[in-house]
Amino acid sequence: MSENINEIAGVEPSFKMDELKFNEKGLIPAIVQDHYSKKVLMMAWMNKESLEISLREKKTCFYSRSRQELWRKGETSGNVQHISSIYADCDKDTLIVEVVKEGPACHTGAESCFFEPVYQNEEITPFSYEGLYDLIMGRKTNPKEGSLSLIHI
């Protein structure tokens, strides 16, 4: 199948389906990411047919390895994922699908399927605006020589 992916999606051509590297079972991993927050929501598998459906409908469609059938995300739950973009990695063997979601991604009701911590380095704290504000206010209270934050405070 050498049909142009962007022709399927209805935009200017630049990428062919044959350039993607599906595994021996005809599948490619698709990492689904929130368009706005960039949070990873889930990982599912696509075959050529589910990718074509996703491009045509602009909603995620995957291939279920356990049921061996296509499934459209949100078909029964209502938690539809509207596709904003799809990127292939440098090896063209994995996709990132950016979506605007309606509801949680996980069948458990969680926003993301990735909520079970395996390891978390306590020395590295996650970014937050609150933390940034505290850092800037700390620099105001206790100026650090050479800090650019001193210029505007």
Describe each region flagged by the PLM.
Residues 151-153:
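Conserved small/polar residues in nucleotide/adenosyl-binding loops
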Residues 1-11:
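Short, compositionally biased leader-like segments
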Residues 38:
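Carbohydrate-associated surface elements
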Residues 9-17, 27, 41, 46-147:
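C-terminal binding/interaction regions
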Residues 23-25:
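Short, flexible loop/turn motifs enriched in small residues
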Residues 32-35:
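Short, acidic, Ser/Thr-enriched surface-loop or helix-capping motifs
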